[in-house]
UniProtKB/Swiss-Prot annotation:
Single GO cellular component term: cytosol
Positions with a binding annotation for Mn(2+) 1: 10, 347-348
Family: Belongs to the phosphopentomutase family.
The keyword Cytoplasm is annotated on this UniProt entry: yes
Functional pathway: Carbohydrate degradation; 2-deoxy-D-ribose 1-phosphate degradation; D-glyceraldehyde 3-phosphate and acetaldehyde from 2-deoxy-alpha-D-ribose 1-phosphate: step 1/2
Protein name (Swiss-Prot/TrEMBL): Phosphopentomutase
Length: 407
């Protein structure tokens, strides 16, 4: 029986990569800076004391972080017995965004440059805005700028509810985001608007990675909240991922938990399970692992590390999330049977101590656990695609164009 379980702790970087300087991210270290803040007693809101991650540490997280950054994260046990394979990897892809990281994990690095809306005000071309107003029959639009998703709701949410004008905004990522109130604007109407935007961006040659529906609820500034009904409309990966190969070459199953299906534009996915929040994502993952058949991948993205704590620069929240994940990790490990492998990794960094609100260019951890996996140091990997190549080799698929297998 061969099954692989891939857990992406979204944004869980472990130290800036060699090329971080060109992204303005030299010195960033998501794990390291969280651990240091906890150790200094500066992250005691909702939790207390040094960062406590015994199960991730036993899989080699501390050792991988030390190899990446030169510093062992304070609070973790330097003398823990290592029961997993560990490594750290740098990104070959040109960006530090979610699709690039995930596609590269699945063996397909993004070697082209995404399009971006780089102007912080009046960010979108007028012809694009006019087209959206016309095609979607809109009374106008709000935003048209770079913004944090929560800040823009406080600024424009009330006006949106009154006027019916959707809020358009972007960031340093290759994204076009649309925020609308679930009740006054309507969720299905928001999704339909995002489909129109996706088509317009693709046909217009803007080369934008994702259109993101950002529904929210609430009745006044300070009370607006984004809901779990986010929907990402991504372009398709430029080549077959290891997920698609498993389905096409072996008739295998690929089960998406959380936003994985959206990230791969639903290509190479045979089942989708929606869940919102760390515990709910964990529960759904446990359920799918219990029933996953032979020749299957269960692939989960734990988005809260990025969206709730990384972008919002919430160090105590990120630390508490990591500790919750670590407490529940033995539930996943107990479901790993003979022939199975469990892979824990990330897609980029999002250092909550770093200036701004954007992702950070960092190494990612690669932690692998299973009865047939030799524990120990698997060194530095020069592309996330080593994960995809490992999966291709493990399942007996045709090799990927990039990456070297771990074993």
């Amino acid at each position: 029986m061969k099954r692989a379980f891939i857990m992406v702790l979204d944004s869980f970087g472990i130290g800036s990569s060699k090329d971080a300087e060109k992204f303005g991210d030299k010195g960033s270290d998501t794990l390291g800076h969280i651990a240091e803040a906890c150790f200094r007693g500066e992250a005691d809101k909702g939790r207390k004391g040094p960062l406590h991650l015994p199960n991730l540490t036993a899989l080699g997280l501390g050792k991988a972080a030390e190899a990446s950054s030169g510093k062992f994260p304070p609070g973790l046990d330097k003398n823990a017995e290592i029961i997993g394979a560990y490594a750290y990897a740098s990104e070959l892809s040109s960006g530090k965004d979610t699709p690039s990281g995930h596609w590269e994990i699945a063996g397909v690095p993004v070697l082209f440059d995404w399009g971006y809306f780089s102007d912080t005000e009046n960010s979108f071309p007028q012809e694009l805005l006019d087209l959206l107003v016309e095609k979607a029959n809109l009374p106008g639009y709000l935003g048209n700028c770079h913004s944090s998703g929560t800040v823009i709701l406080d600024q424009l949410g009330a006006e949106h509810m009154k006027s019916g004008k959707p809020i358009f905004y972007t960031s340093a990522d290759s994204v076009f985001q649309i925020a609308c109130h679930e009740e006054t604007f309507g969720l299905e109407r928001l999704y339909a608007l995002c489909e129109i935007a996706r088509e317009a961006l693709t046909e217009g040659g803007y080369n934008i990675g994702r259109v993101i529906a950002r529904p929210f609820v609430g009745d006044k500034p300070g009370h607006f909240e984004r809901t779990g009904n986010r929907h990402d409309l991504a372009v398709e990966p430029p080549a077959p991922t290891v997920l698609k190969k498993l389905v096409d070459e072996q008739g295998g199953e690929v089960i998406s938990v959380g936003k994985i299906a959206d990230i791969y534009a639903h290509v190479g996915i045979t089942k989708k399970v929606k869940a919102t929040g760390l515990d709910a994502l964990f529960d759904a993952t446990v359920g799918e692992m219990k029933s996953a058949p032979d020749n299957s991948i269960v692939f989960t993205n734990f988005v809260d590390f990025d969206s709730a704590w990384g972008h919002r620069r919430d160090i105590p929240g990120y630390a508490a999330g990591l500790e919750l994940f670590d407490r529940r990790l033995p539930e996943l490990m107990a479901l790993v049977k003979e022939g199975d492998i469990l892979i824990l990794t990330a897609d980029h960094g999002c250092d909550p101590s770093w200036p701004g609100t954007e992702h950070t260019r960092e190494h990612i951890p690669v932690l692998i656990f299973g009865p047939g996996v030799r524990p120990g140091d698997y060194g530095y990997r020069d592309t996330f695609a080593d994960i995809g190549q490992t999966l291709a080799h493990y399942f007996g698929l045709s090799p990927m164009a990039y990456g070297k297998p771990f074993f």
